[in-house]
Amino acid sequence: QILCSVKGGVTMKIDLTEKQFRRLLDLVYVGNWVMNSTRGDDRIREYDDVESTVFANCLSHGMVPLVEAYQGELIPSRAFAEGGIHEAIMAYEDTMFFEILAQELALRDMDSDAPTPENVDELRERMDTYLGEFEQHGTDNITVEM
């Protein structure tokens, strides 16, 4: 059971198994990473606050190594951050990079700006060709002429 205090003094209780709570930590961390990792000093504090609130529950659930204090707040520990979560983020980013690149190149080849119901089959076929190339060779065969 995790407890989350909501503004106005209301406390929310969520019943989770230990395994579910551990997965929730991953989800919260990844969500905050997506929302804030590229923002520099312009972070969305509300997401940091949610992350801190959820990770604070590590203290009462035998997961102390996953949280640490920083500037008066509880944040995911270095042990948590180095425990494989960034490998999952990187795998997702790599997949998205190649999917987006394949779509952009396929649309370029088709002289189209966006997928439409009329071109979706051709687009998918061209994307699959590019994705096969990327799977075999990564970016080794990509050239840019300037």
Task: Say what each PLM segment does.
Residues 32-106:
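Structured domain cores in non-transmembrane regions
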Residues 108-146:
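Glycine-rich, aromatic-bearing surface loops/beta-hairpins
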